[in-house]
Amino acid sequence: METLRFSSNTMQVSFVCQRCNQPLKLDTSFNVLDRMTIHELTAPLVMVTANKQQDSGESSSFPEETFLENKQDGVARKFIPPARMMSAESTNSFTLIGEASDGGTMENLSRRLKVTSNLFDIMSGQTDIDHPLCEECTDTLLDHLDTQLNITENECQNYKSCLELLSQLPEEEEASLLNALQQLKQEEESLIQELESIETKREAVAKELDEGRNHSQLMDTEELRYQKEYCEFKRQQLELDDDLKSVDNQMRYCQIQLDKLKKTNVFNATFHIWHSGQFGTINNFRLGRLPSVPVEWNEINAAWGQTVLLLHALASKMGLCFQRYQLVPYGNHSYLESLSDKSKELPLYCSGGLRFFWDNKFDHAMVAFLDCVQQFKEEVEKDDTGFCLPYRMDVDKGKIEDTGGSGGSYSIKTQFNSEEQWTKALKFMLTNLKWGLAWVSSQFYNR
């Protein structure tokens, strides 16, 4: 609060404003303060009544809450005790020590500084404002206190008006006001009860609302789960629909193929009999031989193997068992077995050469095969009297007659026969087999 400055010959003590911190120059009257003045400064702001002074005069402390009302202005005064009481033995006192021109000057300066500090402590203890203050801050503080004083005086005046108005009210009006007050209290109690009832209902409604929200959240969770399940089932349904469409397409394709297969003649598809120039062919294998077209014997043997297989399949389809011979389809080494002599095999294949001209087993095998074709014809004629092959066969002579054409007969044997006639006889035999194949197909596949 104070600042001390020293020099070799002089010493100066200065104070600063407690608001703006500006240095202050104190009045000389602060240097002369007797004990009576200090006692007046430390006394309470408002003196209490004589009785209370006697009761509390010897006490070192003042009552914390004391109000007195001046009957002239009607203002209640509150005693504010000082924050720090000064005495000769104040603990805040101090002695300034330093160098001076003589001992008396230092003692006087210390005393003045102590008195001034005590005075500022007293002033700060009486109010909430710290001292010292500069002139400008003091003016600002006074303006603020004047404003508060005016507000307080206006409030006191309003209170006095209310008291005068209340004192002028007649007793009857007071009684009516008391009745009205009682009614208002009863109405207040009724409203409080109603408020409590409404609060209870509100709590119940809030509880129901919480339950409804919980139920709504549960329903939202269930809805989300059901939605996921629905999407999963929808995906499975789409996959199953795709699978079903795929299966339907496969069934439709299989049905088309089945219808096509039903219309397909197995024998015609398996055994294709046709001609190539002067040769009769079966599955594109030429059966026969010409001087100008020396067909390989492997091809001729393969053609005989297909022919044996065809007749064997037709007989099996009809349930026909040949007499005297048994067909053994064995590719390009097919042969016939004699039923009277099991050890006797008639080969329907040949390798050519000189042995071919002197070996008559090949010729016997071709005549035996012609016998089997004749038996097939006779079996068909038993079921269909109108059935007739285009070329008549003479098994005893081993010849085939061209009844519808030149009328000549052609031997199926190779010995003592030309290749042209042998090839033509084989061609006529394949033609008869083609007719037999057509009849079996019509009887068993086109019904």
Swiss-Prot record:
UniProt crosslink position (Glycyl lysine isopeptide (Lys-Gly) (interchain with G-Cter in ubiquitin)): 399
Residue segments, region Evolutionary conserved domain (ECD): 242-447
Region (Interaction with BCL2 and BCL2L1 isoform Bcl-X(L)): 109-156
Record-linked Gene3D superfamilies: 6.10.250.3110, Autophagy protein 6/Beclin 1 (1.10.418.40)
Pfam family, one: APG6
Residue ranges, annotated region (Required for membrane-association): 422-447
InterPro entries cross-referenced by the UniProt entry: Atg6/Beclin (IPR007243), Atg6/Beclin_C_sf (IPR038274), Atg6/beclin_CC (IPR041691), Atg6_BARA (IPR040455), BH3_dom (IPR029318)
GO biological process: autophagosome assembly; autophagy; cell division; cellular response to nitrogen starvation; cellular senescence; early endosome to late endosome transport; heart development; late endosome to vacuole transport
Physiological role: Plays a central role in autophagy. Acts as a core subunit of different PI3K complex forms that mediate formation of phosphatidylinositol 3-phosphate and are believed to play a role in multiple membrane trafficking pathways: PI3KC3-C1 is involved in initiation of autophagosomes and PI3KC3-C2 in maturation of autophagosomes and endocytosis. Involved in regulation of degradative endocytic trafficking and required for the abscission step in cytokinesis, probably in the context of PI3KC3-C2. Essential for the formation of PI3KC3-C2 but not PI3KC3-C1 PI3K complex forms.
Recorded family membership: Belongs to the beclin family.
Note: Expanded poly-Gln tracts inhibit ATXN3-BECN1 interaction, decrease BECN1 levels and impair starvation-induced autophagy.
Protein name per the record: Beclin-1
Source organism: Danio rerio
